[in-house]
Structures are given as structure tokens and as C-alpha cells.
Amino acid sequence: VEYKNLNFVSKQISSNFNSNIVQINGDFKNKINLNLISSLLDYNFKDYLDDKILLSSKSNFNISLNKKFKIKDYKLESEINFDSLKVNLDNIDLKKYLTNFEKKFIFKKGKINLILNSNNKTKVKVKSKYVLNDKAEPKEIKLKYSKINSEEKYVLNIDLSEYELDLKKINFNKKEDEELFLNLIITQKKNVYELNNFELFNDKNNFTIKKVEFGNGFKIKDFKLIEANYYNNNNFLNDISIKKKYNNIELKSKNFDISSNIEESLKSTDKSNFFEIFKDLNCIIKI
């Protein structure tokens, strides 16, 4: 079978007829291109993926037709395998945080599992190695995406050990080849984003953020917890916890080195401050 210049090969397709329903089950193998990926996931990937890309896929499907031969129900499960998949990130600038970043993300020897059905449910799972540049050693990445009606969920687990991470605002730097891992859960519903969970950690440092809701301009409308325990570039152990409950914000810290923040503020002509990332919290702050 050929569809949109792509060949489909099937080992088995079976059908079952009764008075009201026609049930069709089967499998097929094919090559997936950019247009088909965009159609399946209802998203245009042309700015991120090469339009000449062809990926190997094997799928199982189930289709139910009513007596007028209109689709009543369907389910598609696909497994896509690849040796290398380059994602172009020309419009994303992470260089000031990830010094090795070269505006590309290359998946290595990975697998994508895709589930689509007629109940407005979509699930995508990616398990792969990755590199940010050609000199790096591939590290693990896992990505899960699900969509049920209008609600979307993203789950990311990534090993950042191969790359230098520089967070000047908090005077933190992680060198190349030093372990660091990121776990991230984000949900989106009706154009409202919520950071459910953020963990950036290794054996010496830990950053945790929970239940952050973003408004316009990605300013923070609400949050539950912002917590950090880390060694800064002065080898000083910082610990800080910011908790919000109802209209009360509690800030606790036994040790926190703000010398670099003061120095940067004195040098900078930018009059912005930390609280500008928040949007009208109207809270009482207890320190």
C-alpha cells in the first residue's frame, strides 16, 4: 500500500463483521517522514526536523466502523526506531546556561513509542541517548508526553553530566564530567502552564521546585515550594526554603551567601529585582 509517497507493508490484516460493527485489526511497517509525524501529532515540526528525514516504524491498529462504514473507534500503537535524530534549536538560546550548547539536540540510538486513539488521547514515550555537540559522550534521556482532551503533560528525565552548567544569578557552576540530573514534570491546560515538579541534583547539590503556576509573560502566579541546597563558586553551602500556603510565604535559611548578588547589583544598570518574576501574589512574607 502507498500513502503520501510512503510504502506500507503488512503481515496481517483481519476483519470481523456483525450486524452493527465492522472490526478491522492489523499491523504494518513503513518509513515515516516529517509530514506524517506532523499529521499524527497535530504539530508542525518543520522548524525542528529535517524535511528529508525517514524513520523506520512498525505499528498495530484497531478500527471499528459503524453500519454506514464511518469510523466509530480507532487505536494506533507505533514503535519508531532510529540511530540518529537531529533536532534544530536555532530559536532557543541556552548558551549562557549550557556553555557547550550549539543550538542542536541529537538523539542517538533511540526509540519512540506512540499511542493514538479516538478518545482524544495521545501518548508519546521517547527513550534514547543524546548529545548537544559532536564531541560529547552520549547520555541518557527519557521523555513522556500525554494529551487527554485539552490537557497536556510533559515528563523529562535527563543526564546533564557531560555538560557545563553555569547559573550566574545564584553563583552556581557545574563543571563538565561532573554528575548532574534533571527531572521535570510540566502540565498545560487552556494556555496555563504549571511546573508540577522540578529536581536538579547530584550528590552535593539539590534544587527543588513544586507546584508553580505561570501567568502571562511566564510570571509566577502561585507556587508551593522553592528549595535549594548547594555549594556555590565560593565553596559555601547555601540552603534556602521558600514555602507558600494560602496568602503566607515563609522564607527560611541557615546559610546563604549573597555576596555575588550584591556585587552584580552594584555593577548592573538593570533595576529589576527578584520579585519581578512573580505576578501579584499579594502575600505576607515571613522570614
Identify the residue ranges that each predicted region occupies.
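Membrane-proximal interfacial segments on either side of biological membranes
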Residues: V1-I287
